[in-house]
């Protein structure tokens, strides 16, 4: 995989054909389903929010066996740095494993991307969406989500404010999108 094509500030989306619970909720760019995303920092590093570890900086090469979509936005060097600095301010936050809005010191992957780009204009940079837990194929909320939220004494937050890598991959702010080969 040619990681040399990545530029600072690129949003990197990951496909995992074996993941069903997140990927089954919608379809993203190119008809693919993305279960994860992060921001490329340069020098082979990615900032991302991952289960069990929260917001971390890691090597993008760990995804070399996955299909990767690169989404690029034409921004000034200053704005790209502002996005990266903001993202780095979230290092150490816990993972928002319930995907609920406004969780103190917790973020999930696409929420991290939204928050980092928010810093450019101090307002939503990407289109806002609501959470959808209906499976595309089954048109019902799967038992996985019902049981997950019930375990924490919550209702499934269908329709609450939130984001998803698939919806984000379709945002019209991206000027250039390509699969990394």
Protein language model annotation of sequence segments:
Residues 1-181:
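Cysteine-nucleophile amide-bond enzymes
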């Amino acid at each position: 995989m040619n990681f040399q094509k990545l530029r600072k500030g690129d949003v990197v989306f990951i496909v995992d054909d074996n993941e069903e619970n997140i990927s089954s909720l919608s379809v993203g760019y190119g008809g693919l389903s993305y279960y994860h995303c992060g921001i490329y920092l340069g020098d082979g590093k990615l900032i991302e929010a991952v289960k069990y570890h929260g917001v971390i900086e890691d090597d993008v090469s760990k995804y070399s066996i996955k299909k990767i979509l690169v989404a690029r936005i034409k921004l000034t060097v200053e704005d790209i740095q502002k996005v990266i600095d903001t993202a780095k301010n979230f290092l150490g936050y816990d993972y928002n494993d319930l995907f609920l809005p406004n969780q103190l010191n917790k973020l999930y992957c696409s929420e991290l991307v939204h928050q980092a780009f928010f810093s450019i204009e101090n307002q939503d940079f990407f289109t806002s969406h609501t959470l959808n837990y209906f499976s595309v194929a089954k048109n019902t909320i799967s038992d996985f989500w019902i049981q997950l939220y019930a375990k924490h004494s919550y209702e499934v937050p269908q329709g609450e404010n939130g984001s998803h890598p698939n919806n984000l991959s379709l945002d019209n702010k991206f000027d250039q999108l390509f699969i990394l080969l």
